[in-house]
Amino acid sequence: MMNDNLTVNNTNKSAGEQILEQFLKFMLEKDMDKWIDLWDEHAIFEFPFGPSNYPEKIEGRSNIYNYIKDFPKKITLFKFSIPQIHHTLNSNILIAEFKCEGQIINTGLPYKQKYISVIEISNGKISHYKDYWNPLVAIESFGGNLATFLDSSPNLKQ
């Protein structure tokens, strides 16, 4: 079930869950300035299943911002599912499963992605985010060509 009316600051939710809800909300709103404020200055954003020539990780809030700042020019996200949260023995780490629906602006093709994210929170900020997504879905949505997909992200640096 998809829901784009995420509830933020629910007192029954952990800090990590609240931050994830804000993360998704700001993505839907295309507010990358608020989105990046959720990240620690020394955060790490990892993509363990990214395609070849895609960075395995991006280190530092400013580099993460350079990676994400043009995202709203490439894709319109319509909604995210309510994340299924798995708590870990470390209360600062959670695992979230969720889906999104959107459309790639340049191709007009739908974007329907499934995510599993491992998120670590330190001092109320995202300190480490492992983003497990299917690059084949993204490549197909960008027209089926890996080069076109990679060219859509000129801010990527390995």
What positions do the PLM features span?
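Short, low-complexity N-terminal intrinsically disordered segments enriched in polar/charged residues
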Residues: 1-38, 148-158
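Short beta-strand segments enriched in hydrophobic/aromatic residues
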Residues: 39-40, 100-102, 117, 133
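A solvent-exposed, acidic/Ser-Thr-rich amphipathic alpha-helical stretch
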Residues: 40-89
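Hydrophobic/aromatic beta-strand elements that line small-molecule binding cavities or substrate pockets
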Residues: 82-86, 114-119
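A short hydrophobic beta-strand element
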Residues: 91-100
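Short, cysteine-centered beta-strand-loop-beta hairpins and adjacent loop/turn segments enriched
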Residues: 102-112
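Short beta-strand edge/turn micro-motifs at domain boundaries
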Residues: 116-140
